[in-house]
């Protein structure tokens, strides 16, 4: 009897164990199925996030009263002179001493090489905007903005810094201010002179430099440098595709062979031979993308952790400027958006539209919240250009892609 009881007990235990095991297998399969669905849903959501919208509302741009949105502020002009003034008024209200500029930088409107390189002087301690001038005169719009700003002056009292060679009549218009001029017009020599001017003001040369192309085919690849050099002390020095100008070599030698040299652009713009030549004067790192759009994104994402050079935008919570590749002058005018406020690098838009690389980049920095969107972080965009250059539809897409979203994918209704 005891034997039978023992056998029966073992049988029951075994049966229960088998049932439990069967239940565990079923639960595991259900768990795997749920996890698989979650992964699939997440992948679908990610794919949705990084592609263009499928259904557009054709009437969205009709009867607009504003061209600025919750996440994207538009400076609505394609005139470089006006863009410079709009930027100046946005960054420097000049209502009191603490938000007046030190010195205003005046740049000939059609000389992009001078314009980009001179942005190094936007940074502290000068702390002032770029405004545009013509060779023989200072436009009325620019004069009025200088008067409104009432620049405080730098350490030596300079209120206006004139870039390039302008006529006597234009200088006469500035007679009420203390003016300093960098007269050089050759791009490489001019960039070297700006580098020296900044070193004279601050007392030392920064170890890091950006090397960009001064040639027309390289213009869009060099353009993103304008925001970094207005944000930080590092200058832009120029090169040609296959030859390093003597002026650039002289500037590099001031770093005593210890320069951190960041080449901006692919080998089709700045050759491997130039990179090799530059390596004689320090450590060379190339930052590049195949197209101007991809190049601007590569620069926005790059960070040298050792030297702290670079934006390093790979996580949420940033400001970003957007400019059409058809209007690069506007990037120079808007460079101060990286000097103060949101400290925004510039992303180029192919013919004013968001392309796949832009969608991919914005997906990596889109903010997400768990249960409280008021905690941030937040992104914000500055759109530099009129609606004829960058459409309201494109602006709406960028606004949505910069918006903070719930990490569960439920949207704002889930909190």
For the regions a language model picked out, list residue spans one by one.
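C-terminal motif of bacterial Sec signal peptides marking the signal peptidase cleavage site
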Residues: 17-20
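Extracellular glycan-binding segments that recognize GlcNAc-based cell-wall polysaccharides
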Residues: 23-415
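Bacterial Sec-dependent N-terminal signal peptides
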Residues: 1-9
